[in-house]
């Protein structure tokens, strides 16, 4: 649920533990 400050529109999430939701990366 915490935003990782990343976009995953083109590339996957870089930070470990972050998942892609609606083109944004979130961790828990």
From Swiss-Prot:
Source organism, top-level taxon: Eukaryota
Pfam family, one: Cyclotide
KW Disulfide bond (keyword) present: yes
Keywords: Antiviral protein, Disulfide bond, Knottin, Plant defense
Cross-link (Cyclopeptide (Gly-Asn)): 1-28
Post-translational modification: This is a cyclic peptide.
Record-annotated disulphide pairs: 4-18, 8-20, 13-25
GO BP, sorted A to Z: defense response; regulation of defense response to virus
Record InterPro entries: Cyclotide, Cyclotide_sf
Role according to the record: Probably participates in a plant defense mechanism. Has anti-HIV activity.
Domain-related comment: The presence of a 'disulfide through disulfide knot' structurally defines this protein as a knottin.
Family: Belongs to the cyclotide family.
Protein name: Cycloviolin-B
